[in-house]
Curated annotation (Swiss-Prot):
Function (record text): Plays a role in the regulation of cell shape and polarity. Plays a role in cellular protein transport, including protein transport away from primary cilia. Neuroprotective protein.
Cellular location(s): Cytoplasm, Cytosol; Cytoplasm, Cytoskeleton, Microtubule organizing center, Centrosome; Cell projection, Cilium
Stretches of the chain forming a coiled coil according to its record: 105-319
GO CC terms, sorted: centrosome; ciliary basal body; cilium; cytoplasm; cytosol; membrane
Organism: Danio rerio (Zebrafish)
Protein name listed in UniProt: RILP-like protein 1
Origin superkingdom: Eukaryota
Region of interest (Disordered), residue spans: 234-272, 323-351
GO molecular function terms listed in the Swiss-Prot or TrEMBL record: dynein light intermediate chain binding; protein dimerization activity; small GTPase binding
Compositional bias of kind Basic and acidic residues: 241-257
Residue ranges of every copy of the RH2 domain listed in the record: 289-358
Compositional bias per record (Polar residues), positions renumbered to this chain: 340-351
Example of a GO biological process term: cilium assembly
Amino acid sequence: MEEQQLGAALDKSAAELSVMDVYDIAAALGLELERVIERTGAELLSRLVPRVVRVLELLEVLVSRSSSSPDTDELRLELDRLRLERLERLEKEKKHKKELELVEDVWRGEAQDLLCQISQLQEENKTLLNNLSIRESPLTEEDIQKQEGMTERERQVMKKLKEVVDKQRDEIRAKDRELTLKNDDVEALQQQMSRLMKINQDVRHRVSVVEAQGKSLIQQKVELEAAAQTQQQEVSSLRQEVSRLKEKLKEQSRSNEEEAQEPVGPPSPAQEALCDEDLSTVDLKDPNRPRFTLQELRDVLHERNELKAKVFMLQEEIAYYRSEEQEEENGPPLPDPSETLRTNPRSNFQPESGIKRLFSFFSRDRSVSQRRMMLNVEPVGDAVGSWTGKQEDVYTETAQEALQHM
């Protein structure tokens, strides 16, 4: 099944790869490396495994970066389009303002020209009035006609000025209305853009939370698989150790039986006397009568104490591994993905990836092998000498219970 998953993950293209595919590839490589270690040993692959882990971590980061959702891309494109429209409208407003400024400048120039003409006409009128007051002579018909002509000219100029001013005023009002409409459109677009930006931020936050939850679940899965593999390896190693001890016990029992069946030399007179006394006191039909010498009984007790010591050391090793498993199971709780995303994402802290946890069984195998070598080298005679009396019974009972559980 795992080989099929590896083949399916490797058959996919680079754009279709997901984080789960990367973890499937890592699990399959871990199994292959485990097989190679079982055949050749872990020393040959001690330098290769960290490099494989680093390559798989880089592949995981690249796949997680490339697997962005299409909704965020669409929102990004929409936001870029709105920004372009806003820039175009701002440029149009600038052009419109420049045109209005030009119109105002033209109007001001024309108004100044007209004011200059009015001032000139007023001065001419004053001069004429002064001339009339100085002369104090009755006006002739020619003077009256000239005065009427001048007034009509002034009226025509004033009328033209008024028409021009009214026309420019109407144009300015129309431009002001257009400006207000454009400003309303710009405000509406800004509100829409802010709303879209908020929606985009919410979507990004949700996507990041979902990605963080998915990564945490994948890491939990990888941790459980690695823990299961290590437990299986430990159980298999303990079974092998127990089977080896059982075989050793059988061999020792066989050797004891062979020693018991060997012929004994001629006894001394004192021994014959003791044997006669024992035979006289012991019933030959009793099934529980003594059949071994004192030295043989001492040898059996010495072997029993050695086996008790080995079983006790194995029991301590099992308790140590169980405590390690309980510490791994009762590890620190996972942090909230939303709180971790709110913190600084560019911090220097990098959590241990699932691939490193998956390949952590290599280091555990080394520690187990070193511990076994230490147990095999340690002398047993010192531990056996201190076990006497009631402690021997307690240790034998605990060792038997441990063997039954295994």
